[in-house]
Amino acid sequence: PTINITNYDEYIYISNASFSDKPIAGFDLDYTLIKPKSGKLFAKNKDDWRFLFDNVVSYLQSIAPTYNIVIFTNQNGIKKDAKREMFLAKIVQIIEAIQLPIHIYASKTNGFMRKPLTGLWETCLSNIKSKHTNHFYCGDAAGRPDDFAATDLMFANNNNITFLLPEEVFKEEKSDIEYSWPEYLTQYSGSSAKLTFEVEGPTLLLMCGYPGCGKSTVVNTLDGFTAVSNDTLGTKAKCIKATKELMLKNINIVVDNTNLSLANRIEYYKLAREWIVSKKGNPYNIIVIHINNNIQFCYYMNQLRCQLSKGVQKLVPKIAYHTLKKRAEFPALSEYDNIKIITHSSMVDEYIYQFPPL
């Protein structure tokens, strides 16, 4: 059969057949169905692979009449042409070796189409248009002591499907794998307390915290404040300009940015000081609201935003978090005269989706 390859923006779809009206038998690729035959951690060329177990093909043959066989694999490196060509050449070899109807979804970006987010699975389901529910998914990344991650277990759980380890499927070994919610999340379980504070005269409110900490959620609960944000205006310079213009109206302003560096906050303190010197209106009070959830919680919420918006809300990349953490200067009373600092933690009623740590 002809092998069809379609290269989408965020993933590649490869198949040699149409979908049938059957449930899905889902598999990860590396260290679930195959491994490098060189013994190295990563394949060095398109020929550097072998089946993980001797019975992989015979097992797939045994389930093919009952299931659509689908591979879901994260392949971040295949954005580059050379890596993509090597990967596709290897996939063609694997399909030819298996000699069965097969479908492969290979994620090539970070975001909704990358496991454990559910984009690949949802795309597959939409292609089948089937009402079957007895799917399963098999993968090696399950959070065991020697596993590099728990991505596959999370992917199955996020899609509410049965999870199996390769050893369970191909060697019939029994296992009992469960996901344990990490303490960096469970410490924020519960209902969020409503943030209340008194405002006397015109007030400039600076939000402070990592992306995903819940700054905008707090801002949306504030009455009588006009928001200024990089997300809507695009640059810091435009935020400063907009704040200056709003101060001319003597109204309450909230700056909904990370504001994690002292230098950034000082720019707004300067506006308030210039305001006092110019005597254009009542002096602006400054309140800094520091959302102090740990960075792992914030990265989790960043992934959750991407998941719930089905990729419309783009992921803030890991490197941005690491850079912010390295440079973060949390607010202190000594920064400015008559400053008020409020610390607040965002809370979550219930965790449903599972995502990897930073």
Can you say where each PLM-predicted feature lies in the sequence?
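Glycine-rich phosphate-binding P-loop
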Residues: 204-223
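Substrate-recognition element of Asp-dependent hydrolases with the DxDx(T/V) motif
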Residues: 56-91, 100-111
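Non-catalytic pre-domain segments flanking phosphatase-related domains
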Residues: 1-27, 129, 150, 169-203
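Conserved substrate/cofactor phosphate-moiety recognition/catalytic segment
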Residues: 217-266
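Acidic, metal-coordinating catalytic cores used for nucleic-acid/nucleotide bond scission
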Residues: 76-83, 110-113, 143-145, 256-268
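Conserved phosphate-donor/acceptor-positioning beta-strand/loop module used by diverse small-molecule
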Residues: 280-301
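Active-site neighborhood of HAD-like aspartate-dependent phosphohydrolases
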Residues: 2-69
